[in-house]
């Protein structure tokens, strides 16, 4: 099976890190390679322009793709969102020069020139808002266009707004929200690779479910068992098993990382000892 990933840009690094957490690691170090074998037998990575991934997935040429919601919306590709990822969060915004004393997009001059590479999204947004504008099609950085005089405003992706500010621009409206996702062809379940695809998706969801969670092991004397167990959070309930040749028990539970100090403090107060904390790679539901 083939998984399409961005060949560059803001999603490439996080996509590779995510696949690594799943256990899918590229087995070639040559950046020029466009199709790369992985640590999973029968699974290949294909590096494609992020904006092309939705259409390539739609054709069935690749089985899965990692891209952004903004690119899926812009392409109009008939694909299925299979896994929502926890990276690539951004906003598509309408930004104007800071010198413009406006906050409402409807206050822009008629036939304002807006530079964007998201023509379909921008057109739908402008129609929805009833704004008369002329779209300037670009494929590179939009932020520089007003400074060059090639456009008056832009519609582009921003995460922090720092780049906009650097180029003397300010956002006045959010056109849409975006995030990274795993997409598939609408007919992926009928594919010859359906079983392998399903396993990959299961492992992807498992890796996401494990993010920010810790597993805690502790020993507890018989007399303190009830107090310790009642103090602990768990996904269902703490696991308890008797230690051989001892009046003590091993208790195992899972908690969110931010709750860890509080959980350990309560467990120790209740009588737990020999506490060991380990990372969790995957939680398969």
Swiss-Prot record:
Question: What GO terms are given for molecular function?
Answer: ATP binding; ATP phosphoribosyltransferase activity; magnesium ion binding
What is one GO cellular-component annotation here?
A: cytoplasm
Tell me the pathway: Amino-acid biosynthesis; L-histidine biosynthesis; L-histidine from 5-phospho-alpha-D-ribose 1-diphosphate: step 1/9
UniProt-listed PROSITE patterns? ATP_P_PHORIBOSYLTR (PS01316)
Q: Identify the domain of life.
A: Archaea
Q: What is this protein called?
A: ATP phosphoribosyltransferase
Regulation of catalytic or functional activity: Feedback inhibited by histidine.
**UniProt entry keywords in alphabetical sequence:** Amino-acid biosynthesis, ATP-binding, Cytoplasm, Glycosyltransferase, Histidine biosynthesis, Magnesium, Metal-binding, Nucleotide-binding, Transferase
> Which SUPFAM superfamilies does the protein's record reference?
GlnB-like, Periplasmic binding protein-like II
């Amino acid at each position: 099976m083939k998984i399409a990933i961005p060949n560059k840009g803001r999603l490439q690094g996080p996509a590779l890190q995510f696949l690594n957490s799943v256990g899918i690691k590229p087995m070639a170090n040559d950046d020029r390679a466009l199709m790369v074998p992985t640590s999973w037998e029968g699974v290949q990575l294909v590096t494609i322009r992020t904006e092309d991934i939705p259409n390539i997935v739609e054709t069935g040429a690749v089985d899965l793709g990692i891209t952004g919601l903004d690119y899926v919306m812009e392409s109009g590709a008939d694909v299925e969102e299979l896994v929502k990822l926890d990276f690539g969060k951004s906003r598509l915004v309408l930004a104007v020069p800071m010198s413009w004393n406006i906050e409402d997009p409807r206050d822009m001059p008629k036939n304002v020139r807006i530079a964007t590479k998201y023509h379909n999204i921008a057109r739908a947004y402008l129609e929805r808002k009833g704004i008369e504008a002329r779209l300037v099609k670009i494929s590179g950085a939009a932020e520089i266009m007003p400074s060059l005089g090639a456009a008056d405003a832009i519609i582009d992706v921003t995460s922090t707004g720092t780049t906009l500010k650097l180029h003397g621009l300010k956002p006045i409206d959010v056109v849409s929200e975006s995030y990274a996702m795993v997409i598939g062809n609408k007919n992926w379940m009928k594919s010859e690779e359906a079983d392998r695809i399903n396993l990959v998706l299961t492992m992807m969801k498992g890796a996401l479910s494990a993010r920010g969670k810790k597993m805690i092991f502790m020993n507890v004397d018989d007399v303190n068992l009830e107090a310790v167990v009642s103090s602990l959070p768990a996904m269902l309930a703490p696991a308890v098993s008797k230690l051989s040749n001892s009046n003590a028990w091993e208790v195992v539970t899972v908690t969110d990382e931010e709750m860890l100090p509080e959980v350990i403090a309560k467990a120790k107060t209740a009588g737990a000892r020999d506490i060991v904390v380990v990372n969790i790679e995957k939680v398969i539901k």
